[in-house]
Amino acid sequence: MNAPDSFQTDLDALHEDMARANMAPTWKYVSDFVAKEPRVGFRPWLWRWNDVLPLLMRAGDLITPERGAERRSMEHVNPDLKSAYSTSHTIATAFQLVRAGETAPAHRHAAAAIRFAARSKGGSVYTRVQGERLMMEEFDLLLTPAGTWHEHANETANDIVWLDALDFPLVNLLKASVFEPGDSDTCEPKPDDFSRQHLGLYRPVGWSDYPEPHPVMRYPWVEMKAALDAAASSGATGSPFDGIVMAYTNPLNSGPTLPTLSCRAQLLRPKESTCAHRATSSTVYFVISGTGTTVVNGTAYRWGPGDVFVVPNWAWHEHLNGDSDAYLFSITDEPVMRTLGIYREQAYAAPGPHQLITGEFDSTQQCVRELSSL
């Protein structure tokens, strides 16, 4: 009759001895590390341009190169990821301000980065990557692949603000972060459009192969917008989940923008309502123009020009556009998930392709209000 008690006593003793040996019983904790579906660990969030810009401009007066600030940027920190200073678990975005006449010194790091010109009046404002100058017209995308030397300069009379996106949360998780300061003459200068000329369809005979493992590229917004508009004009239906959407591809292999980050631009046509879906990738959005709503797990996030919002991995989401065309830029960690063989995507099917809206994000109070309290 004492057998069950003896079993439990012996099992408890085994567990205690295992703990002292720094071992863990899989039969007891398997559900903690082998989940039936992704455990997200952070919430959707939205940062309004009109709230962030005044803070950035105040920083422009206080944080200066003369006071030792190498970069003047403000991170979009998810409330659930404060210790990592990140926007999603793998992506960190920020707004960076470079005032008229300022420069930011050269450095390089293990994290890959992109720059998206959120507000620019053009002219001689640029990032120099591996010695090549990449100009920044408004809404242009510039790449800073992992380990590349880069510096910034604004030789105009106007401030510029761009969106930074880096994979440093992932790099830090892998304990692979490296940072190295440099000088403006660290890399031999290259002519403007060096990469586009070397990677184009036509190249002078006798030119050497492209020297970089990942392209140092500038993707002009005028070209991307023309591609989106042409697709819409042709009558293309686009994606049921994202409308007309285009990826910024790697010209060396037609793959993702960078090994860890894929950048995209999408056009939502007037009154367009996309179907809900979810994926094991997380995505950060920047609103180029237009107004609309993205519903994430039943909560409505209303957005306008300059706003930034994050959709966590495995979160149901869909877009509801307003009365005019809306253009969105986004960064996703989908390449990481595909490389690891763990990318999954699922369409929302019950009871239909759209979620029931149960709440709305209140950016003023920084909270979600349930419909019953609205």
Curated annotation (Swiss-Prot):
Job description of the protein: Involved in the biodegradation of 3-aminobenzoate. Catalyzes the cleavage of the 5-aminosalicylate (5ASA) aromatic ring to form 4-amino-6-oxohepta-2,4-dienedioate (cis-ACOHDA). Can also convert gentisate, but the catalytic efficiency with 5ASA is 70-fold higher.
UniProt entry tagged with the keyword Oxidoreductase: yes
Cofactor(s) annotated in UniProt: Fe(2+)
Activity regulation statement: Inhibited by SDS and o-phenanthroline, a ferrous iron chelator. Partially inhibited by EDTA.
Phenotype on disruption: Disruption mutant loses the ability to grow on 3-aminobenzoate or 5ASA.
Activity relative to temperature: Optimum temperature is 10 degrees Celsius.
Induction text: Induced by 3-aminobenzoate.
Protein name, UniProt field: 5-aminosalicylate 1,2-dioxygenase
EC numbers: 1.13.11.86
